A protein has these predicted regions:
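C-terminal motif of bacterial Sec signal peptides marking the signal peptidase cleavage site
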Residues: 16-18
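Short, conserved, GDST-rich strand-edge loop motifs in beta-rich repeat architectures
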Residues: 276-292, 337-341
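A short helix->beta-strand "capping" segment at the edge of beta-propeller domains
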Residues: 23-45, 304
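Structural signature of eukaryotic scaffold interfaces centered on beta-propeller domains
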Residues: 47-52, 96-100, 142-147, 191-206, ...
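Conserved blade-ending motifs and adjacent loop-strand segments that build the rim/top face
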Residues: 43, 88-90, 238-248, 301-321
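Beta-propeller blade signature
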Residues: 164-166, 289-303, 342
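Blade-loop segments of beta-propeller domains
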Residues: 77-111, 132-134, 312-316
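Beta-strand-rich domains and repeat architectures in extracellular enzymes and scaffolds
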Residues: 37-67, 267, 271-281
């Protein structure tokens, strides 16, 4: 009788272990296919980012003579190039993050820890310096503007997940914590977590909600003056990593060759959050055998999974059009080129 009770207790415990936090991966009940079409005369050497404003696609390049190329959808050709690469006046060093509005631009020189505001003329693609050069802490990796005077920064910080910065690059406050899906992850130093959970952002101005995607986790954070509060955290793919700390810095990487590469980009609209997902594994990537096509995972701003879009190509970076009906991307066809991905409806 005693042995039967032990077996019964063990059987009841199995669901508890199988449903541990590390296994609560997001799932979708709906999926749809999407067809890609390469645009004419739209080749890119090493793509970094792509954004759409009106008729123009702005494609970032890592090693071109210019770091930003302007492609006209109506003319189906590159019509201009911006951000000449170099170390002279009005030149830029790769890699850069760029943010454009109708009349302004914000350029972040990521590996040189500086940023600059500009006025922007969309008619002739000219930019003009505005204000002083912003010097950023060397611990910052990515920045994202959420208003005219506030920026969210991620990087490798000892005591927080995010920094909130003002227009001069000053730290206004510190916010946020990291996921703890890996067993014992809560004991890992913040600096190692920051190296592994590198973030990309999108922002909903109406909701004042920040979307943050790492390779394995999607998070929604509510912004109130000078602070971020976690609204929802979703596991995109299970992960496990190891880290090493020494006087020269911190090193962290996945130690599971069969783990999926996971999220590779994020785009947002007023209605949805889109995550560019790579289902290939670390092993497939190392052996240059990535046979699975990219997917786009769609969520609403409450974190509800809406559908999975299965594309027919490998996508490096992407953005969504204003109507939530098509995606513009840099894809492999087989060379890097700008294309459009149209889901079936």
């Amino acid at each position: 009788m005693k042995s039967k009770n032990i077996i019964l207790l063990f059987t009841l415990a199995l669901p508890l272990f199988s449903c541990s936090e590390s296994q609560k991966r997001v799932s979708f009940s709906e999926s749809t296919s999407a067809k890609s079409t390469a645009l004419k005369e739209a080749f890119i050497s090493i793509p970094m980012d792509i954004k759409k404003k009106g008729d123009i696609l702005y494609a970032g390049d890592f090693k071109g003579d210019s770091l930003l190329y302007c492609y006209s959808l109506s003319e189906q050709r590159f019509v201009n190039q911006m951000l000449p690469q170099g170390q002279g006046p009005d030149e830029f060093l790769s890699p850069v993050e760029f943010f454009l509005s109708d009349s302004s631009a914000f350029i972040h020189n990521r590996w040189h820890f500086t940023a600059q505001n500009y006025t922007f003329n969309a008619k002739d693609f000219s930019i003009r310096r505005q204000g002083e050069l912003i010097h950023l802490p060397m611990s910052i990796d990515r920045v994202y503007p959420i208003s005219e005077s506030r920026f969210i920064a991620s990087g490798v910080f000892e005591d927080c997940r995010f920094l909130i910065l003002d227009n001069d690059g000053n730290v206004i406050s510190k916010s946020g914590d990291f996921p703890n899906y890996q067993s014992g992850e809560e004991t890992i130093p913040n600096t190692a977590k920051g190296m592994f959970h590198q973030s990309q952002f999108g922002y909903n101005t109406d909701r004042k909600r920040l979307a943050c995607a790492t390779s394995n986790v999607l998070e929604l954070w509510d912004y109130k003056p000078e602070t971020l509060t976690l609204h929802k955290r979703l596991l995109l793919a299970p992960y496990h990593y190891q880290f090493n700390s020494n006087p020269d810095g911190v090193y962290a990487e996945s130690d599971n060759p069969d783990a999926e590469l996971g999220a590779r980009g994020i785009a947002v609209s007023n209605n949805y959050v889109y995550v560019l997902y790579n289902p290939n594994t670390n092993r497939m990537h190392e052996e240059q055998k990535e046979t699975l096509n990219s997917e786009i995972w769609v969520f609403d701003w409450e974190g509800k999974p809406i559908r999975k879009i299965l594309t027919d190509t490998h996508i490096e970076c992407f953005c969504v059009d204003e109507t939530d009906t098509s995606f513009y991307c840099v894809m492999t066809a087989p060379d890097y080129c700008i294309g459009i991905v149209s889901p079936s409806h």
